[in-house]
Amino acid sequence: MIKNPKVLILTAHYGNGHVQVAKTLEQTFRQKGIEDVIVCDLFGESHPFITDITKYLYLKSYTIGKELYRLFYYGVEKIYDKKIASWYANFGRKRLKTLLQVEKPDIVINTFPIIAVPELKKQTGISIPVYNVLTDFCVHKIWIHREVDRYFVATDHVKELMVDIGVPAEQIVETGIPIRSSFELKVNPEIIYTKYQLCKNKKILLIVAGAHGVLGNVKELCQSFMSVPNLQVVVVCGKNEALKQDLLSLQKQNSDALKVFGYVENIDELFRVTSCMITKPGGITLSEAAALQVPVILYKPVPGQENENAMYFERKGAAVVIRDDSEVFAKTEALLQDDVKLLQMKEAMKSIYLPEPAGHIVDAILAENHAEPRHIPIKSPALAQSFT
């Protein structure tokens, strides 16, 4: 039995999802009495300049670089077994070796496809269990390595895809993607309506615009939706202050039709009262929507994992996918007027969701490493005034 195991969680700041999953797992380990947990952005710490450039290109894939990202995502899939695999496998290796020597972790978890650890195991024979937590509803070969001990995945669909490319079924566990614990608590919606000054007698359309301008024509969309009877539009701008200020002028015209927020810490509260949501198809956002059974309208997925996520939710009947700006208003308005369709989508979301994914992942890892978890009950937090 490992007494007080040290856990190293490797992640990367490409979008917020991978880091959020890492933090959720860290909190869950601590909740179960495992205090020695380190979260590390291996690529950012190893090669900050290269990481900054690639993060910039990643964000540009939402606007001017979609074809470039398509080539990267699907191209790497085809040539992964060649030279690029060797280069990528050793990216961050120097920093990793230092981490392993100094921190001496008992367990390593990846929430980003970092294969430096399993590659180091292969080359040096070091003995350390490695776990990959996949953060999308699809799989890319870059996640796969023979020296990974176990994979935790979103659905049985992802498991089937992995088995098809040669991963033994017994190494794959369907747990769902870890989400913030607030999404799994019970909250009185009446308090939410009061807190955010929302109309209980109207349907609510939530638009998650994001900090990087990845959702286009937001102001024009809001103007169109403000004319729809019995609808209140709620826009979360994230840290995009320019967008927030631009939309606040619209809100002043009719605050019953439009509510604008910047960064919302407890965004699960808005999920709980919305009729449907326009967003990008990131794996974590979709998992959170599934947890609260929120029908989603997925805006112009980028080729790659976003597109794969969108197609999966569309096939399951849980999402409407928008591929052209001209479709957004008409398809959204039609959905909002179709209560039967909205209910069917909520049921589809319910069928996708697996409860308490972070807890199941942590319990499985601790059990495999013969570490006894100490359970501390989670208390339901009061609704925080944490939005701007």
Swiss-Prot record:
<dbReference type="InterPro" id="IPR009695">
    <property type="entry name" value="Diacylglyc_glucosyltr_N"/>
</dbReference>
<dbReference type="Pfam" id="PF04101">
    <property type="entry name" value="Glyco_tran_28_C"/>
</dbReference>
<comment type="pathway">
    <text>Glycolipid metabolism; diglucosyl-diacylglycerol biosynthesis.</text>
</comment>
<dbReference type="Pfam" id="PF06925">
    <property type="entry name" value="MGDG_synth"/>
</dbReference>
<dbReference type="InterPro" id="IPR007235">
    <property type="entry name" value="Glyco_trans_28_C"/>
</dbReference>
<keyword id="KW-0328">Glycosyltransferase</keyword>
<keyword id="KW-0119">Carbohydrate metabolism</keyword>
<keyword id="KW-0808">Transferase</keyword>
<dbReference type="GO" id="GO:0047228">
    <property type="term" value="F:1,2-diacylglycerol 3-glucosyltransferase activity"/>
</dbReference>
<dbReference type="GO" id="GO:0070395">
    <property type="term" value="P:lipoteichoic acid biosynthetic process"/>
</dbReference>
<protein>
    <recommendedName>
        <fullName>Processive diacylglycerol beta-glucosyltransferase</fullName>
        <ecNumber>2.4.1.315</ecNumber>
    </recommendedName>
</protein>
<comment type="similarity">
    <text>Belongs to the glycosyltransferase 28 family. UgtP subfamily.</text>
</comment>
<comment type="function">
    <text>Processive glucosyltransferase involved in the biosynthesis of both the bilayer- and non-bilayer-forming membrane glucolipids. Is able to successively transfer up to three glucosyl residues to diacylglycerol (DAG), thereby catalyzing the formation of beta-monoglucosyl-DAG (3-O-(beta-D-glucopyranosyl)-1,2-diacyl-sn-glycerol), beta-diglucosyl-DAG (3-O-(beta-D-glucopyranosyl-beta-(1-&gt;6)-D-glucopyranosyl)-1,2-diacyl-sn-glycerol) and beta-triglucosyl-DAG (3-O-(beta-D-glucopyranosyl-beta-(1-&gt;6)-D-glucopyranosyl-beta-(1-&gt;6)-D-glucopyranosyl)-1,2-diacyl-sn-glycerol).</text>
</comment>
<dbReference type="GO" id="GO:0009246">
    <property type="term" value="P:enterobacterial common antigen biosynthetic process"/>
</dbReference>
<keyword id="KW-1003">Cell membrane</keyword>
<dbReference type="InterPro" id="IPR023589">
    <property type="entry name" value="Pro_diacylglycrl_glcsylTrfase"/>
</dbReference>
<dbReference type="InterPro" id="IPR050519">
    <property type="entry name" value="Glycosyltransf_28_UgtP"/>
</dbReference>
<keyword id="KW-0472">Membrane</keyword>
<keyword id="KW-0444">Lipid biosynthesis</keyword>
<keyword id="KW-0443">Lipid metabolism</keyword>
<dbReference type="GO" id="GO:0005886">
    <property type="term" value="C:plasma membrane"/>
</dbReference>
<dbReference type="GO" id="GO:0009247">
    <property type="term" value="P:glycolipid biosynthetic process"/>
</dbReference>
